[in-house]
Regions:
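Active-site helix-to-loop segments that bind/position phosphate- or nucleotide-bearing substrates
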Residues: 124-312, 317-328, 334-336, 340-345, ...
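A short, conserved structural fragment
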Residues: 394-396, 473-484
């Protein structure tokens, strides 16, 4: 880590007026500050830089003792973190005083999660959320450990269920099909084939078996459904012309195949259709969104959602707003999969390989919506992008939150803000952010906290801070109530009407 990298990091802090996902500032004028939480969070996410010797307003204070601070940092990483963390530590002269910077590298997946040893894994493991270090949830810890240990959650048996809860006719057809396609299977009896295929375990249906062949999976897991809602406006809670909160509402249940069909039916029923009649009088109906893109997204939500014990009470959500469709499924991205590499990596690891295999083996290669989507495995996201482009619509947005993954499709009513706003924040605010700028500014006619703004928008605080608040403060459209302490827990924001 060279001095230029440190100086650029300080410039970023001052420009944005806040810490970032990758940069943390610590005051160290009066002694060695607490930083095990930041070391843990950077190690568990994408790494980062800690700069010691800056005030809350990012002015240079210097450190109490350069040599002692470096020694304690090294000891903390080596002796107090599990696994031990190697820190790249660099003292630097800046604005007449000495600072100390520590670069924390992301740990390999095989070594995560990193935690403060004294706190133990459940109290000492942290993750980076926007500009803050947050204690990891039991689910976040489990997600990293289960990947590391290769835990097949889709093969866990459903103890209260029996083989009789599976659709016998479909099981018979499946066994007949795999026997014809896999001669080595033909020598086994049906029960053994079901076990080898992952349909059952110790004569109990597995999660994969239930979600693919179950008579009624929701009898055992009531929350494994899709909640579909058509909203009258652009935000949750916005009322329609007749005072209605929803235009349409449906709970979609069944197997993965049945839920895909039900969700697509709901989406088609609640989107606009353009009718084109050519010179010959032939009528063509063009839906508001490309059905193929939606099919890919819903299939991904069903097939790749987390089916572990930590998320079995969480359901998939489908929202149809006036300007967009949102599809939200429980579970973080699996293993090494990254949001910035979606649709570009040719090798992506699957969370539920047994569910995917059963679906592929169950259906003929040309049969139905589900098989068409499964055939596009590893190309589903490029397909979504390509289909949206064919319709002249914006690229879909992919958002990873804490314990969830969201896909957003915008229609043609998703317009950008006036030029003045979009010019001011074009390098910081994406298309979906600019659509919300006026809403945020109106809401902040009186001072609002980050939590209030995030709850109002129905988004996470880290996402709102990064995508909305930081650019608007930077451009003087929002003003802090406590400008001298940007990180204050009492901080609020209000619209600059000057």
């Amino acid at each position: 880590m060279d001095q230029r990298e440190i100086v650029e990091a300080i410039a970023t802090l001052r420009e944005y007026g806040t810490e970032t996902y990758l940069i943390e500032a610590k005051s160290a004028k009066g002694g060695f500050p607490k930083c095990y939480d930041t070391i843990s969070s950077f190690s568990n996410k994408h790494g980062g830089i800690i700069i010691f010797g800056l005030s809350d307003s990012f002015q240079v204070e210097g450190v109490y003792d350069v040599e002692d601070l470096q020694k304690k940092l090294t000891e903390l990483g080596k002796n107090s973190m599990s696994p031990p963390v190697h820190l790249d530590i660099s003292p630097v002269e800046f604005e007449g005083k000495t600072l100390v910077a520590a670069k924390v590298h992301e740990l390999p997946l095989s070594e995560k999660p990193c935690y403060y040893t004294k706190g133990g894994i459940h109290r000492g493991a942290y993750t980076r959320v926007g500009e803050s270090d947050e204690q990891m949830t039991p689910y976040e810890i489990y997600a990293q450990q289960s990947y590391k240990e290769g835990v097949p959650d889709d093969l866990r048996p459903i103890e209260r269920a029996s083989i009789d809860d599976l659709n016998g006719e479909e099981i018979i057809r499946y066994i007949k099909k795999v026997k014809s396609e896999k001669p080595n299977f033909a020598k086994n009896d049906d029960r053994k084939i079901m076990r080898l295929s992952g349909i059952c375990n110790d004569n109990k249906p597995t999660m994969a078996g239930m979600m693919v062949f179950g008579d009624y999976p929701q009898a055992y897991y009531p929350q494994l459904f899709i909640a579909c809602s058509s909203m009258p406006g652009k935000e949750l809670g916005e009322l329609g012309g007749d005072g209605q909160r929803f235009n349409d509402n449906q709970r979609v249940e069944g197997t993965i195949e049945q839920m895909l069909s039900g969700a697509l039916g709901f989406l088609q029923r609640n989107m606009k259709t353009k009718v084109i009649i050519d010179l010959s009088g032939k009528r063509t109906d063009i839906p508001e969104y490309p059905i193929r893109a939606l099919r890919e997204a819903v299939t991904n939500a069903l097939v790749h959602r987390d089916y572990s014990k930590y998320t079995e009470r969480a359901y998939i959500q489908v929202y149809v707003y006036s300007d967009r469709i949102e599809i939200i499924n429980p579970g973080t991205l699996y293993g090494p999969n990254r949001i910035d590499r979606l649709g570009t990596d040719t090798i992506m690891e699957a969370r539920n390989p047994n569910i995917i295999r059963l679906l592929e083996e169950k259906y003929p290669a040309i049969d139905g919506d589900l098989m068409r989507a499964l055939e596009n495995r590893h190309t589903g996201i490029p397909t979504m992008r390509r289909e949206m482009a064919k319709y002249g619509l914006p690229e879909p947005k992919f958002i990873e939150g804490r314990g969830l993954f969201k896909v957003v499709f915008y229609n043609n009513s998703h317009d950008s803000e006036p030029d003045q706003v979009s010019d001011q924040v074009s390098d910081q605010v994406s298309d979906q952010v600019s659509d919300q700028v006026s809403v945020i500014l109106d809401y902040c006619n009186k001072p609002r906290s980050l939590k209030e703004i995030a709850n109002f928008l129905g988004m996470t605080r880290s996402y709102v801070s990064r995508k909305y608040i930081v650019p608007l403060v930077r451009n003087n459209q929002l003003v802090r109530t406590i400008p001298e302490k940007p990180k204050s827990q009492l901080q609020k924001y209000y619209r600059n009407c000057r």
